[in-house]
Amino acid sequence: GRGCRAGRPRSPGRGMTGCWCLPMQAELDGAAYAIRTDYRDILELLRWLGGTADPQLDQSGRWYVAMRLFYPTFAEMPQACWPQATDFLAQFLAAGRREQARPGPPLMDWQQDAPLIAAGISRAAGQDVRTLPYLHWWSFLAWFDAIGEGSFATVVAIRDKLRRGKRLENWELDFYRTHRAAVELRGPASPAQEAEKQRLLALLQ
């Protein structure tokens, strides 16, 4: 079968062209593939990758769903291109940055923390980004990185201290007691919990 080479971007928007351009398509083996770039689409994709959309899917299954969500014409993509397409998706999610993963459990969850993140990003952007008809994922991340002091920063700082066994300040302890449900990250539902959820939903229909 025909191999797949990651095409070298030759013009803005044709691939991963660095942080000064916003990639709008992927070039794989000389062919251009459309990609979904709006931050809402990417957050949905991350919900599947993180296992919250379907806890019963294994890692390979999650990535397969993510690829189908990211590439609208994934069904037409030669299977030989899948590894390069996966690499492109991973780089896109990281906004082209090469960052070392932090050890230990995650400190945030895009779904659980959505209200806090939306408030912080809207403050950084000077507008409610949820009302925008379109916002590129990289632009969304740039505003996310610009979130300063606020509830989201406080929640993440407390989670980090709890993870490392550090003592909380008195005001942090008060915040934790008052907003415990917001501070404590909820993991994906277990198969048993998901089955019970589906059973209850069936009773309501």
What is the predicted function of each stretch?
Residues 1-2:
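N-terminal regions encompassing targeting/leader/pre-sequences
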Residues 5-34, 39-43, 50, 59-205:
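Charged interaction scaffolds used for protein-protein
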